[in-house]
Regions:
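Short loop/turn motifs at secondary-structure junctions and domain boundaries
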Residues: 2-4
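Beta-lactam-recognizing serine transpeptidase/beta-lactamase-like catalytic domain environment
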Residues: 6-78, 82-193
Length: 193
């Protein structure tokens, strides 16, 4: 159940060392073979007997999984700072760059519109204002100025296409791995989705 879990990592930003890690949606390590989720236990109990063992095994594997290491999540709006740094480094944007946010933006003709969190729009904003407003359409625009090739080159340079190498088992693969990203991929990845 996604709504009943949380994951947190505290990292030494100078060394990358994991200082603390916690996952809520856990189990009792003194009784690791007891399914902690009461609803899941009840659901399994209702299954035909021949299906219960497989369902129990799957539920136990899911609760033992270290979601901080083994699951992959989109970075969300914090990724906008990466897009911003790319745009500034490549000189495709400056502090004077402007973009008019109308509340949504169609990055690729014929595709769906992508909404801003401010559905009435921010109006015309500078680079600083677009960043302060965390405006998704503004960052889509920056991504388009960069283009897919340059954008992916930075993905690789920042190490986003590789595993971190954390000294824990089960690290998942990156969600960013396709150099042949579409223009719609570029649009959503430019603001962290």
């Amino acid at each position: 159940k996604v709504e009943n879990r949380a994951t947190g990592i505290v990292m030494n930003v100078k060394t990358g060392e994991i200082v603390a890690m916690a996952v809520k949606g856990d189990y009792d390590p003194n009784n690791p073979f007891v399914i902690a989720d009461e609803e899941e236990r009840a659901r399994i109990a209702e299954l035909p007997e021949e299906e219960q063992q497989e369902a129990t095994s799957a539920a136990l594997q899911a609760q033992w999984r270290n979601k901080a290491v083994s699951d992959t999540y989109y970075p969300g709006s914090v990724f906008k700072m990466v897009t911003l740094s790319m745009a500034l480094e490549e000189n495709v944007a400056t502090e004077e760059t402007t973009f008019t946010c109308t509340g949504s933006y169609v990055p690729v003709q014929g595709e769906r519109a992508i909404n801003c969190h401010n559905t009435s729009g921010h109006g015309t904003q500078t680079l600083v204002q677009g960043t302060m407003n965390s405006c998704n359409p503004f960052f889509i625009y920056l991504g388009q100025l960069l283009g897919t090739e340059t954008f992916f080159d930075y993905f690789e340079a920042f190490g986003f296409t590789q595993k971190t190498g954390i000294d824990l088992p089960g690290e998942s693969q990156s969600i960013y791995h396709d150099r042949d990203m579409s223009l719609m991929d570029l649009a959503v990845e430019s603001f962290g989705q």
